[in-house]
UniProtKB/Swiss-Prot annotation:
A GO biological-process term: translation
Name listed for the protein in its UniProt record: Small ribosomal subunit protein uS8
Organism (species): Maricaulis maris (strain MCS10)
Entry annotated with the keyword rRNA-binding: yes
Keywords, ordered alphabetically: Ribonucleoprotein, Ribosomal protein, RNA-binding, rRNA-binding
Quaternary structure and interacting proteins, as annotated: Part of the 30S ribosomal subunit. Contacts proteins S5 and S12.
This protein's record includes keyword Cell membrane: no
Pfam families in the record: Ribosomal_S8
InterPro entries in UniProt: Ribosomal_uS8 (IPR000630), Ribosomal_uS8_CS (IPR047863), Ribosomal_uS8_sf (IPR035987)
Gene Ontology CC, one term: ribosome
Gene Ontology molecular-function annotations: rRNA binding; structural constituent of ribosome
Function: One of the primary rRNA binding proteins, it binds directly to 16S rRNA central domain where it helps coordinate assembly of the platform of the 30S subunit.
Length: 132
């Protein structure tokens, strides 16, 4: 199956798994997905992830979702910059997601990072998604 937006596909898989209260979800592996998962893990939105290689050579990430008292830690995960419409922001214009209770994940010249890390590094970039 051809996927035009691999990151959007991963976010949709996570969103669907959370709606069904799944413990884990699998998604094909890529470098960008790994960096986004690193940010989600460091910010406490997922428990962990591991790379699994199948006999056919296909690599996937198994993402362990995080729940607190039966509710998912992620209440909303939304793709912002899409292949058809890229959204960029300078460091002064970085959005506050739910007044600072959520995060924006950015792709910057210094790598993929959260909005708070981007402010500390004084760098802007492409806003990949919002998580709250």
């Amino acid at each position: 199956m051809s996927v035009n937006d691999p990151l959007g596909d991963m976010l949709t898989r996570i969103r669907n798994a959370l709606m069904r209260n799944k413990r884990a979800v699998n998604t094909p592996a890529s470098a960008l997905r790994r960096r986004v998962l690193d940010v989600l893990k460091s910010e406490g939105y997922i428990r962990d992830y591991a790379e699994v290689e199948h006999a056919s050579g296909l690599k996937e990430f198994e993402i362990e979702l995080k729940y607190f008292e039966g509710d998912s830690v992620i209440s909303e995960i939304k793709r912002i910059s899409k292949p058809g419409r890229r959204v960029y922001s300078g460091v002064k214009d970085l959005p506050l997601v739910q007044n600072g209770l959520g995060i924006a994940i950015l792709s910057t010249p210094k790598g993929v990072m959260s909005d708070s890390t981007a402010r500390e590094s004084n760098v802007g970039g492409e806003i990949l998604c919002h998580v709250s």
